[in-house]
Amino acid sequence: MEKQYLTVTALTRYIKTKIEYDPHLQSVWLKGEISNFKYHSRGHMYFTLKDENARIAAVMFAGHNRNIKFRPENGMKVLVKGKISVYEASGSYQIYIQDMQPDGIGNLHLAYEQLKVRLEEEGLFSQVYKKIIPPYAKTIGVITSPTGAAIRDIITTIKRRYPIGNVIVFPVLVQGESAAPSIVQAIRTANEMGDIDVLIVGRGGGSIEELWAFNEEVVAREIFTSEIPIISAVGHETDFTIADFVADLRAPTPTAAAELAVPNTIELQEKVLQRTLRLQRAMRERVHKKEEKLQVLQKSYAFRYPRQVYEQKEEQLDRALEQLVLAKERYIDKKVNQLKQLSFYLEKHHPSQKIIQTKTAIETLQKQLQREMQTLLQTKEFVFVRAAQKLEVLSPLKVMMRGYGLVYDEEKQVLKSVKDVSLGDAVSVQLQDGILDCSVSSIEERELNNGK
């Protein structure tokens, strides 16, 4: 029988088909620890599930992982549901996860704690960014369910405490998948209106699932970026949501939020009355002090003898005028003297005088320079003539005119002794009117007169 060889692709696809048709492998529940976690830019998650003895590659596509509330991390123990298949390119089997829950802790509770830690590290809970709630808000925006008890409590409280306050309700969903986007859009709409002084965002109490919209990151960030101060009013006193931490002020209940948003009219009236009484008392005291001061002035010398006071002041004015005239004259005299001194100094140091003096000095120096140059020229001319005369006396040409000549060897070196040549050497004799080329045919050596 002839052997049939399979391709790697064919074998891999066969194994994949076997696995995918196995009902036990198409609905698998696993628990394990996450490692090598990677979050792809397209939203897919890739990681490894492991226990003490084995590991398996895991994939969770974006369509499934967008439904989980917490953030998977390396080292986290999880419970997953999925199916087993083969990744043909590597020939490895892996689990394709459809659902994932944290092992040992609630899904929502873990997501809550993770988001709380992350936003706190970013500074969204810092008191530095908290906006001040206006003390006398004219327009109060309320973002909540239009049918719940919360809106009734808020409106009743505001109308009772502050009847002149204008309430604008932004109806939203407060639970379910669409609740968070609904709340975010309401906050944006309120900010775009531009005439709202404070916002109340909240709902009545409930379970963590029912309150979850106020734990969503998008809601928290929208509250943080709101230009309008926000009071959170979610649940009851024991319920804390992420929105409570980010809001500018947290109220334990919707009723308490309304009380924090507006003042009490009765308390305001009492304050106005107290301030009116305090102002009246201050005015009476001020008038009394002014009356006492007026009485003192009326008893003063100026009020009793105004004519004498006028004459005294008139005399003082005359003396002051005389002193002013004298001071003016002294000042003018002083300035005239200063002007004369400056004029004399200017005339003495006028540039024209300096120019004349400098011009005279230059002319004197020019004449002196010409004399010295003439003297120097004559001296140099005399020295030159004497040197020329000496040079002429010592010139070899003068000696040659008396019958002498200069003898050179073949290398044009002057011969000074018969010892410098040999028989047959070619020599040149320079006379005053030309050169003789000669050959040495005999040498006769003579003694010098000095015996050398």
UniProtKB/Swiss-Prot annotation:
EC number: 3.1.11.6
Keyword entries, A-Z: Cytoplasm, Exonuclease, Hydrolase, Nuclease
GO biological process, one term: DNA catabolic process
GO molecular function: exodeoxyribonuclease VII activity; nucleic acid binding
Main location: cytoplasm
Subcellular location: Cytoplasm
One cellular component (GO) term of this entry: cytoplasm
Catalytic reaction(s) noted: Exonucleolytic cleavage in either 5'- to 3'- or 3'- to 5'-direction to yield nucleoside 5'-phosphates
A Pfam family assignment: Exonuc_VII_L
HAMAP family assigned to the protein according to its UniProt record, in alphabetical order: Exonuc_7_L
Family: Belongs to the XseA family.
Quaternary structure note: Heterooligomer composed of large and small subunits.
Task performed by this protein: Bidirectionally degrades single-stranded DNA into large acid-insoluble oligonucleotides, which are then degraded further into small acid-soluble oligonucleotides.
Protein name: Exodeoxyribonuclease 7 large subunit
Species whose genome carries this gene: Bacillus mycoides (strain KBAB4) (Bacillus weihenstephanensis)
Lineage, uppermost ranks: Bacteria, Bacillati, Bacillota, Bacilli, Bacillales
